[in-house]
UniProtKB/Swiss-Prot annotation:
Transmembrane segments: 4-26
GO BP annotations listed: cristae formation
Family indicated by similarity: Belongs to the MICOS complex subunit Mic12 family.
Iron-sulfur is among the record's keywords: no
Subunit structure: Component of the mitochondrial contact site and cristae organizing system (MICOS) complex.
Name listed for the protein in its UniProt record: MICOS complex subunit MIC12
Organism: Kluyveromyces lactis (strain ATCC 8585 / CBS 2359 / DSM 70799 / NBRC 1267 / NRRL Y-1140 / WM37)
InterPro entries, per database record: Mic12
Topology of the protein relative to the lipid bilayer: Single-pass membrane protein
Key words, A-Z: Membrane, Mitochondrion, Mitochondrion inner membrane, Transmembrane, Transmembrane helix
Length: 94
C-alpha cells in the first residue's frame, strides 16, 4: 500500500510540475504578463539603449503653477494648526 501511495504522490507531483512548466514556459502568455518579465524587458531595453523615457519639460516662466491634491493641502493645514496649538500650550510653561 505504501508503494502505491508513494507512486501516486510522485505521479501527482510530477504532473503538476509538468503542467506548470508547460503553461509558464512553453505556452508563454502567462509568463509574459508577469511583473518579472516586464521588469526584465525594461532592464534589457535600458542596457541596449532602446529604452524610451517620457520626459516632462518644466516651464521656465515665473508663472508656473504647482497643483497639489486636496488631501495634501488639508494635511498641511491640519499640521499647521496642531503646531500652533502645541506652541500655545508650551508657551504657558515659559
Amino acid at each position: 500500500m505504501s508503494k502505491l501511495l508513494k507512486l501516486t504522490g510522485f505521479t501527482t507531483l510530477s504532473t503538476l510540475l509538468g503542467v506548470s512548466y508547460y503553461y509558464y514556459v512553453i505556452d508563454r502568455p502567462l509568463y509574459q504578463q508577469t511583473a518579472l518579465h516586464k521588469t526584465n524587458v525594461q532592464v534589457e531595453n535600458i542596457i541596449d539603449n532602446k529604452a524610451q523615457f517620457q520626459y516632462e519639460h518644466m516651464s521656465r516662466d515665473s508663472q508656473a503653477v504647482v497643483q497639489r491634491p486636496f488631501a495634501e493641502t488639508v494635511k498641511d493645514i491640519w499640521n499647521k494648526e496642531v503646531r500652533n496649538t502645541a506652541d500655545w500650550l508650551y508657551s504657558w510653561g515659559k
